[in-house]
Amino acid sequence: VPGMVGDGIRMAWEAGAGSEGTNMELASVAGADSRAMIGDVSDSAKMNATAFCPATPTFQQPNLMVNLLGERFMDEEEMGNGTFLANAVARQRARVGFVIYDAATARLYENEGLDWPMAISQTTKVPNIDAEIRKAVADGNHDLFVADSLDDLAAQTGIEAAALKATVEEYNTACDTGRDDVFHKRTAYLRSLREPPFYAGTVRPGGYGSLGGIKINHRTEVVTKDQDVIPGLYAAGTDACAIYADSYVFVLPGNTMGFALNSGRMAGENASDYVKAPAG
């Protein structure tokens, strides 16, 4: 965010504040050009136009996901929780996963809509998926792939081909029987991969935003590393939010805002009481 460069945290530290929970929230990026999300991203509109294409949300759905070893590594239904997904992907080789679906699933998303809408939208239908993905690839998006065979897909992505084909065969059997014995994904999200072209998009961990920095107590008073109160100094919001470590609680939407709102109220009230208190 323009203008937010850590001045408040640095001033508090210079005043003797302890440091606590200084971290970046772990989040996931799926089906987007990760190179466009590195460096100066202050112009969010420009970044979004470069990183995302209209078909990006199709790679944020609960379809088959594998790592570079060609293995599934989590229940794809949990992709809806960016924290769970990012933590799982971060443990894989090269910290990357691949969501894969075929032409039949693409038609489903075009005609009936996505399983999960990933943003505020008036429709969940995604038109012209094949054309949009091919255009993104032609424009230089190195995180999306189109292939006419699984061998070709493996060659493009670097996934181990034999393992990928074995996983797809096992997954297709689960789709046919309606029973996922590996991760017990619900039948509604079991869709086979048999009809080319095959589409893949990378899933990578990324930083959602900074958290923590200033150590406070339950009265929002700033304290030193030894928990000694610094009189008259209060802090609130994300600069003092150390309740998540590196994993935001996506199952409780708005909780960062809730902490900011209420810690700000508490800090304001306590600072007012401090100013009004008799000297000495």
Question: How should each PLM-predicted stretch be described?
Answer:
Residues V1-A36, V251, M257-M266:
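Glycine-rich loop(s) and the adjacent beta-strand/alpha-helix scaffold that form part
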